[in-house]
């Protein structure tokens, strides 16, 4: 089966910040691999069906940085001042254009920032004449939401040597691990089918385990890896390849399912006529894509999310039948944010993009600004963010907006033709497998992140990451060396 790349979301533009290109090749999300579902299917068992028509109260306003700031109580004054840094990782030959960045900032009325000449490293130069949707989306919204935070562009042509249709994440991670001061926050909008990545018949599993080791090592150094949850609901690419049988069991995505990263889902705006609110992003409701989520078939549930996930399973609302998923696995997403109908400039044109590829750089930018504030207060960076989020949901539940409407039963596509599964996960009060802990309230989370009492909590997160490194090393005596395709 093909990997499940997370497609770019709504259009977006970023202010021209200091962008440096690293790696063996400039690439971004594989825009050439369409994630839009145009297939109508029915099954003799009723497992797959087309549900037609979109929700009558869909909000079609394009999402821009100002919309995001208003939605999440995110002040315009939040900018980089104290040494924070951030980056995007791109594969499959995605490029971005500085001209598009300029156009984006002009469109959103943001003051343009001076941009240093991009430092291109590797075997692929940034082909600005062929800017792609994924790269443009990632760079524009990471920079647009975290102004004046130095931003880096890591691009690679490498592929997984065992499953060459998948990304070569290891080269990227080892490159960062070898840097003295790598960026503190990394936004990753790519994903593959977990079962393919951990295929025991082709030797791929040790490669994935080595990638996890590098994730854990970076977390132990204070870095945050923010990953998109996917754009084809809970059944993912398996249902797209074989709708008749693909809906019989959830198809977790990786590295979204990894406990060593923080995973981001997507929401869309809806209205009841008097107010606008967020619901789970679903193609059936006009959201273009359906946010990914579910439970890993490989990883056991980490202790930091045990109580939240167990409450969801015990409640039973929005929980599919037991045979559909691994109820003891690592559950995702951890958090969510708007990911439908983003305004983006691509190759000189203003376009609209949707996906968890949009919500992920938004959350990554938020963490970059939290880091900047912490560094200014003499505190360490956030590191692995997921444990902090779950701790905060217990101590300060109002720091999140609970998303209690929607499901992830469908693939991506148009409301009239999208394929949907009968079994899936639904939204409910508290953590759920469609939207995690909910969407963030920037102002409240920032205050909590700056709370001096959290300094010790984050140190505990670092210690936890260090233990994970030791554990991974003990099981990976023959750790693979990075492979360049």
For each feature predicted by the language model, list its residue ranges.
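Substrate-binding/charge-relay-adjacent region of secreted/lumenal peptidase catalytic domains
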Residues: 1-263, 296-354, 374-377, 437-454
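Secreted peptidase-domain scaffold signal
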Residues: 422-426, 431-472
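Hydrophobic/aromatic hotspots within intrinsically disordered, low-complexity regions
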Residues: 9, 35, 462, 468-469, ...
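Short glycine/serine- and small hydrophobic-enriched flexible loop segments
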Residues: 364-372
């Amino acid at each position: 089966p093909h990997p499940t790349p997370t497609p770019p979301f709504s259009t977006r533009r970023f202010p021209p910040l200091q962008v440096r290109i690293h790696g063996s090749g400039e690439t971004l999300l594989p825009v050439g691999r369409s994630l839009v579902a145009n297939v109508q299917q029915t099954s003799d068992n009723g497992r797959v069906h087309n549900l037609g028509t979109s929700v009558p109260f869909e909000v079609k306003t394009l999402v821009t940085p100002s919309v995001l700031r208003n939605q999440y109580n995110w002040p315009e004054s939040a900018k980089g001042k104290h040494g924070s840094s951030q980056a995007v990782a791109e594969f499959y030959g995605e490029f971005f254009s500085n001209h598009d960045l300029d156009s984006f900032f002009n469109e959103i009325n943001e003051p343009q920032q001076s941009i240093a000449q991009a430092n291109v490293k590797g075997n692929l130069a940034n082909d600005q004449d062929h800017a792609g949707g994924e790269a443009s989306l990632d760079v524009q919204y990471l920079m647009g939401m975290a102004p004046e935070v130095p931003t880096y562009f890591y691009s690679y042509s490498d592929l997984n040597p065992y499953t060459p249709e998948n990304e070569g994440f290891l080269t990227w991670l080892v490159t960062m691990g070898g840097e003295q001061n790598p960026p503190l926050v990394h936004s990753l909008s790519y994903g593959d089918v977990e079962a393919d990545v951990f295929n025991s018949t082709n030797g791929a599993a040790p490669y994935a385990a080595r990638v996890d080791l590098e994730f854990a090592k970076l977390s132990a150094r204070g870095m945050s890896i923010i990953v998109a949850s996917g754009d084809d609901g809970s059944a993912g690419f398996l249902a797209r390849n074989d709708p008749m049988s693909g809906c019989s069991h959830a198809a977790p995505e990786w590295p979204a399912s990894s406990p060593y990263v923080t995973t981001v889902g997507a929401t869309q705006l809806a209205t009841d006529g008097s107010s606008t609110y967020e619901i789970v992003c679903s193609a059936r409701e006009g959201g273009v894509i359906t946010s990914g989520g579910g439970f890993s078939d490989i990883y056991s549930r980490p202790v930091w999310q045990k109580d939240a996930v167990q409450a969801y399973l015990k409640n039973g609302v929005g929980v599919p039948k037991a045979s559909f998923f691994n109820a003891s696995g690592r559950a995702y997403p951890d958090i969510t944010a708007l990911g439908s109908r983003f305004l983006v400039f691509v190759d000189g044109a203003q376009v609209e993009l949707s996906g968890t590829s949009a919500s992920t750089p938004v959350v990554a930018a938020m963490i970059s600004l939290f880091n900047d504030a912490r560094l200014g207060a003499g505190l360490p960076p956030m590191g692995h963010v997921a444990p902090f989020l779950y701790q905060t949901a217990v101590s300060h539940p109002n720091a999140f907006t609970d998303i209690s409407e929607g499901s992830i039963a469908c693939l991506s596509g148009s409301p009239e033709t999208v394929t949907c599964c009968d079994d899936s996960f639904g939204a409910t009060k508290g953590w759920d497998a469609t939207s995690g802990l909910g969407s963030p309230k920037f102002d409240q989370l920032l205050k909590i992140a700056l709370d001096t009492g959290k300094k010790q909590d984050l140190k505990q997160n670092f210690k936890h990451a260090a233990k994970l490194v030791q554990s991974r090393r003990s099981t990976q005596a023959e750790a693979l060396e990075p492979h360049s395709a």
